[in-house]
C-alpha cells in the first residue's frame, strides 16, 4: 500500500497464455514513467537535482577495511559417487565504523575527478571501463562519466582475465578505473587490449605490478598509469564544466558475469536509466 492508502500497483492488462497480467504504479497506470521529474533527461541532470534538493544531507557512507583475517576450513564435496574433503581458505574483513560525507562533498569530488579525466583525454568520443569493487570511488568514477558524457562499461570485479578482456575489447575501451588488488588481473590481458591507454587505480598497489603495466602500455599514444588521488588533484587545478548529453545517448554498457559463457554487454541510454 502507498502512504495515501492506494494499492501500490494496479492491473492494466489481463494475463495471456503462459504470461501473467501486467501491473503498473497507481501513479501512472496509463503509461510507463519516463522520468522522475520534469526537465530531467539524463543521469547528470538527475544527480544535479539531488544535489540541489539534498546537498547538505550526509547520504554517502562507507567503511574502510581495517584488517583481513583468514581461516582454514575443511569442506566436503561430492565428485561422482565419492565424497572428497579439501581445505579452503576463507577470508573475513574487519571494517571501520561508518564514515559519512554530504551529497555536496561527494559531488565536489566528482567535479574534480571528471575534470581530471578530461585532462587525460577521456571524453564523449572514448569509452571507459569500471572494473572495481562497488564503493565510493566506483560511484565517483561512474558519476564523472555521466557528467562528461563518457560511455562507460561496468565489469564485475570477480571477472577473470578472459571476461575482462571481452569487456575491454568489444567496446574498444581506452581508459579503465580499477582497484590495486585487481591490477594483477588487468596485467594478464593488457597486451591483448592495445587500445587501452589510461589506467587509473586506487589503493596501495604492488610496485612490481605497476612497473610491468607501465612497461606494457608505455609505447601507446598518450598512455598514462595514474592513481585515483592524482586524477582528483589534477582535476582540481584544471576544472572543466560538464559536457552536454541527451536522453538518447548511450550512458552505460553493463557486462554480465559470464557465468554461462562470455560476458554480454547490455546497452543502456540515459532514457533507460532515469525511467
Regions found by a protein language model. Give the residues of each.
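Conserved AMP-binding/adenylate-forming
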Residues: 64, 69, 73, 82-105, ...
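Structural core segment of the AMP-binding/adenylate-forming
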Residues: 2-12, 46, 147-233
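Conserved S/T- and glycine-rich ATP-binding loop of Class I adenylate-forming
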Residues: 128, 145, 176, 250, ...
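Cytosolic, low-complexity regulatory segments enriched in Ser/Pro/Gly with interspersed Lys/Arg
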Residues: 1-26, 245
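Conserved AMP-binding A3 loop
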Residues: 100-103, 251-275
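Short glycine/proline-rich turn/loop motifs
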Residues: 27-29, 84-97, 232-241
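A short N-terminal helical cap/helix-turn-helix that marks the beginning
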Residues: 3, 11, 37-87, 108, ...
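Conserved pre-ATP/AMP-binding loop-to-beta segment of ANL
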Residues: 58, 219-226, 232-255, 262
